[in-house]
Amino acid sequence: MPKKVHPEKYTSKHLLDYWNSEFIVHQSKPYVSLRWGGLDLQSFKELLNYYDVYTILLAIEVATKSGTIISEFRNNFEDYDSHSPHPKLEWLVKDRGNKRQKNLWYEYEDISTRWFPSASDRKRLSEIEEELKEWAK
């Protein structure tokens, strides 16, 4: 069994493997590329040059739910990007968080999307952020 690699050390091969596993989860069938596999790896390599790995991982989850192909994903990446202010926290909570962390994240999203957050809302946002950052260490 290969040793699990931390996401910050992911290469294009790791991202392709993650794409394939997420595609199976969401589409109930394996991803079959219509192109030579090296082009898919090149697509992920190009994305890694411009985006944070956690931003890419979040976008992969969105794209595989819709059954997108990798070349379309790369060409229209902005359509799949969640534009999260904290992509690392969001991905870690969604991937590894327990019910408590997930509820905190949903509360964070709820408060952060309010048009006119009160002072207590902003304070609660910083408390949630601190707690999740402490958990993510």
Listing of model-derived features with the role each one plays in the protein:
Residues M1, K133-K137:
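Short intrinsically disordered terminal tails
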Residues M1-Y50, Y54:
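Long, charged low-complexity interaction segments
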Residues S43-E131:
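Short, cationic/aromatic linear interface patches
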Residues V25, E130-E134:
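Intrinsically disordered, low-complexity segments enriched in glycine/proline and serine/threonine
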